[in-house]
A protein has these predicted regions:
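Acidic, His- and aromatic-enriched active-site or binding-groove loops in soluble protein domains
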Residues: 60-78, 186-210
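Short low-complexity, flexible loop/linker segments enriched in glycine and/or proline
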Residues: 55-59, 184-185, 275-277, 380-381
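Short secondary-structure capping/turn micro-motifs that flank functional sites
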Residues: 49-50, 176-177, 198, 371-372
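Glycine-rich, mobile lid/loop segments that gate access to catalytic sites or pores
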Residues: 169-180
Length: 395
């Protein structure tokens, strides 16, 4: 029996050239964040199932990869309801909240964190969407003022700009304004999450599609009309603490990047409590990144409330866009030492070792005499900047 060689649906093999591009994107993002005072941490890919399943993770809860218990823990005859006690993380924010609660005594306040790692979601694969994909997150924990939002909204766009994207804008809203919009449309607060799921589809299905979706969920025509009318709300007409904060954020950030208020912006995570935002590009249908404030997520670990704000870059989308532009990472100096006769092996190794620590990439190749020409051409195609044929023990 021969096994299939293609990776599982929604995952991908990454070739060396693509890996070089991914490393470049990671390094650019990481270095930008470090310049703004953020430090990198790492959390496990596997978390306890109760953390993931009781998280207000929105639609992601339906796409959770669960890990079956093993050995004596998987006692099917005992009639256990839960066959899994672990799961793969579907974002980096939940693990960060657990990490902070576990290590807060050893961390500065506020804590400015960088996370770069894979996450998993059991969703239907499509172009630009994978079941395993990388996220690049930056979060500020312990600061309740809007300085956190402003710092993130001037840091993440800078990383995106350094990656070569210019035609983008920041859109911003606030979960408190969303709730106000729903409640003033005579819709019960218990339906807030349901209504937000419909509003979140407006870019895909349009206003009429949202109207139909809400009707199917049982909202009356009066409620739907009131909500649709408020979807055109002008920020200047709003007078609340949330509206004033959004205005101030826009006033500061707009000096550096284009920012606009979007009353229909939802973001999928139910744990957001305040400002929410996205970076949208005209070069890609969808966002290049997004995030928001989540001031209650850490409450499940401790009694005192800890405010927090985070922003996640759409790493895979950015990589796909750069690949579509045929972007090539600047080639490092690569030197190949080629020999035919085995007696030159030691000499080739010695020459290679002389370059250790000089920042040059070296490789050794033994080639058959009748294939030397073909091999040299192949090495040039692979990006070697210098090819040395070792055929003399004295030089």
């Amino acid at each position: 029996m021969k096994f299939r060689t293609k990776p599982a649906k929604g995952t991908q093999d990454i070739l060396p050239e693509d890996m070089a591009l991914r490393n470049y994107v990671q390094d650019t993002i990481r270095n930008t964040y470090r310049e703004k005072g953020f430090t990198q941490i790492q959390t496990p890919s596997v978390e306890n199932i109760e953390l993931l399943s009781n998280s207000d993770g929105g639609e992601n809860l339906r796409m959770l990869f669960k890990i079956l218990k093993r050995g004596e823990k998987l006692d099917l005859e005992a009639g256990e309801k839960e066959l899994s006690d672990l799961g793969l993380r579907f974002d980096l924010t939940l693990p960060l909240s657990r990490f902070y609660a576990n290590n807060r005594n050893d961390l500065p306040m506020p804590f400015k964190a960088i996370q770069i790692g894979d996450v998993w979601r059991a969703e239907r694969p499509q172009k630009g969407r994978y079941r395993q994909f990388m996220q690049c997150d930056v979060d500020i924990i312990g600061e309740s003022s809007i300085v956190s939002e402003i710092e993130l909204l001037t840091t993440v766009p800078e990383a995106i700009k350094r990656l070569g994207f210019d035609n983008f804008k920041i859109v911003i809203n606030d979960r408190r304004l969303l709730k106000e919009m729903v409640l003033t449309s005579l819709i019960d607060e218990e339906l807030f999450g349901t209504v937000c799921i419909s509003l979140d589809k407006v870019d895909k299905i349009g206003v009429e599609g949202v109207r139909k979706d809400l009707a199917e969920k049982g909202l009356t025509e009066v409620q739907i009309d009131a909500l649709i009318k408020r979807m055109d709300t002008n920020l200047a007409s709003l007078d609340s603490d949330a509206a004033r904060e959004i205005k101030q954020i826009i006033d500061v950030v707009s000096a550096y990047y284009p920012v606009e208020f979007d009353p229909t912006l939802v973001r999928g995570m139910g744990y957001y409590t305040g400002a929410i935002f996205e970076v949208q590009s005209s070069e890609f249908k969808g966002s290049l990144g997004g995030g928001g404030r989540y001031d209650t997520l850490l409450n499940k670990y401790q009694n005192d409330p800890i405010p927090a704000v985070g922003f996640s870059i759409g790493f895979e989308r950015i990589v796909d866009l750069l690949k579509s532009k045929n972007m090539k990472v600047e080639t490092e100096e690569k030197i190949a030492f080629v020999y035919i006769d085995p007696i030159y092996l030691s000499k080739a190794v010695a020459l290679s070792q002389e370059l250790v620590g000089q920042g040059k990439i070296t490789s050794l190749y033994q080639v058959k005499k009748n294939k030397i020409g073909k091999k040299l051409n192949r090495l040039k195609e692979e990006g070697f900047t210098e090819i040395i044929v070792v055929d003399n023990l004295d030089k």
